[in-house]
């Protein structure tokens, strides 16, 4: 394979992995530990 193809595949896998981790953090099990600043602020 050419170097450019491998670089594109590597960057694509990195992007998909980062997106999956971000979705897991936002909506998965760790989301219960996230704080909500709007809930904490009393008007």
UniProtKB/Swiss-Prot annotation:
Localization annotation: Plastid, Chloroplast thylakoid membrane
GO BP annotations listed: photosynthesis
Chain ranges passing through the membrane: 7-27
Alphabetical list of InterPro entries matching this protein: PSII_PsbN (IPR003398)
Membrane topology, from the record: Single-pass membrane protein
Segments forming a coiled coil: none
Primary site of residence: plastid
Domain of life: Eukaryota
KW Membrane (keyword) present: yes
Family annotation (HAMAP family): PSII_PsbN (MF_00293)
Function: May play a role in photosystem I and II biogenesis.
Annotated family: Belongs to the PsbN family.
The protein's name in its UniProt record: Protein PsbN
Species: Staurastrum punctulatum (Green alga)
Lineage: Eukaryota, Viridiplantae, Streptophyta, Zygnematophyceae, Zygnematophycidae
Gene assigned in the entry: psbN
């Amino acid at each position: 394979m050419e170097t450019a193809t491998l670089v594109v595949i590597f960057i694509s896998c990195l992007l998909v992995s980062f997106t999956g981790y971000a979705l897991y953090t936002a909506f998965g099990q760790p989301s219960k530990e996230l704080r909500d600043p709007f809930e904490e602020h009393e008007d």
